[in-house]
Amino acid sequence: MKWQGRAILLPGIPLWLIMLGSIVFITAFLMFIIVGTYSRRVNVSGEVTTWPRAVNIYSGVQGFVVRQFVHEGQLIKKGDPVYLIDISKSTRNGIVTDNHRRDIENQLVRVDNIISRLEESKKITLDTLEKQRLQYTDAFRRSSDIIQRAEEGIKIMKNNMENYRYYQSKGLINKDQLTNQVALYYQQQNNLLSLSGQNEQNALQITTLESQIQTQAADFDNRIYQMELQRLELQKELVNTDVEGEIIIRALSDGKVDSLSVTVGQMVNTGDSLLQVIPENIENYYLILWVPNDAVPYISAGDKVNIRYEAFPSEKFGQFSATVKTISRTPASTQEMLTYKGAPQNTPGASVPWYKVIATPEKQIIRYDEKYLPLENGMKAESTLFLEKRRIYQWMLSPFYDMKHSATGPIND
C-alpha cells in the first residue's frame, strides 16, 4: 500500500533546553529532599472527660430496688442516699432478717432488764452494807467513849483500893471491908475487859463491812460489765442483720444526677450500673488520649495536636487544636483503661503498652449555625500527634539504616 500523504518533520528540541530543564528539575528535587522536612505523625483514639470525672455508681449487692431518693438533674452531696435495695430472703416462717431482728431485739430487752435489776440490786446491797457500817461505826464510837470513862473510873477505884489497904494497916477498917473493895475493883476490871472486847469486835466488823462494800461493788460492776458486753455483741449482730436486710446506696461525691439506670421494683445484680453523677460546675473539658509506646518518647507537655471529634465530623467542622498537658510515664493498667469507653482494647497475644496523655482543647464550646454546641463527657475523638521531625532525605534513607542495623555485628561498649 503506497503512502498517500506528505510527512512534516518538526524541528527537534534543542539540547541545551533539555539539559537546562533537567538541571532545574534535579536541582529543585535535591533542594526539596535536602532542605524540606517532614514530621512523623500517628493517629490515636481518646475521649472527652472532665476533672473530676463523671462518677458511675454500681450495685455491690443483688436485690430489689424498693425506694428511690433522687431524680435526674437533682443536685446531691456526698453521703446523700440514692437508692434503698432490699436483699432479704423469705421462708415459710416469714422474712428471715425480720425474724432474726425481732429475736435480737427481744434479747436486748431482756439484757437491759437484767442490767437494770443488777444496778438496782447493787444500790440496795451497797446501801444496806453502808447502813450497817454506819451503825457499827456509831456503836464503836459510843463503846470507845464508855471504855475511856470506865478506865478513868478504874483508876479511881484502884486509888480507893490502895487507900483501903492503908486504912486497914492503920486499923481504921477491918479486913472484910478491904476484901470487898478489892473484889469490886477486879469486877470492874473484868467489865472493862468485856467492853474492850466488844469495842474490838465493832472495829473488826467495820473493817469487814468496808471490805464487803468494795467486794460487792466490784462483783456487781463485773456482772453489769459482762451484760453490757453481751448487749454490745447483740447490737453488732443487729447491725449485721440490717446489712442483710436492706442496703442504702449513697452518693460518693458532690454533683448532679445525670442519669438513673434503674427504677423502683427492678431487680439489680452485683456490678449493675445504678446512676451517673457529673460535677456540678464544669470549668474545663479534657481529652484523654491513649498513645502507644513507640510514640510517647517524642511527645512533651505543650505540644500541639489536631483533634477530630466523632460527634463533629471533620468534613463539616474541620479539625480542632489542643495542647498536651500531662503525659504518664508508666503504662496504664488494664483496670484503669476499662473505666474509659474510648480506650483501645488489647487482643489476646498482642498486648501493647498504652500511655495516658491528657490534652486541653482550645475550644470548649463549638459554634455552628448560630448555635453553641458544648463538649460532653465520653465523646469519642481521634487525635493526630506530631512526633519526630527529619529531613526528607533522611526518611528516604531510613530503609538503608534498617539494613545497616541488620548487618551490624555485636556491639562492644
From Swiss-Prot:
Membrane-spanning residues: 21-36
Topological domain ranges for the Periplasmic compartment: 37-413
Keyword field: Bacteriocin transport, Cell inner membrane, Cell membrane, Membrane, Plasmid, Protein transport, Transmembrane, Transmembrane helix, Transport
Alphabetized Pfam families for the sequence: CusB_dom_1, HlyD_3
Broad class of the protein's primary localization: membrane
One CC-aspect GO term: plasma membrane
Segments on the Cytoplasmic face: 1-20
PROSITE patterns recorded: HLYD_FAMILY (PS00543)
Domain of life: Bacteria
Cellular localization per UniProt: Cell inner membrane
Membrane topology classification: Single-pass membrane protein
UniProt keyword annotation of RNA-binding present: no
InterPro entries the record matches: CusB-like_dom_1, MFP, Secretion_HlyD_CS
Function in brief: Involved, in conjunction with CvaB, in the secretion of colicin V.
The family this protein is said to belong to: Belongs to the membrane fusion protein (MFP) (TC 8.A.1) family.
Protein name: Colicin V secretion protein CvaA
Organism: Escherichia coli
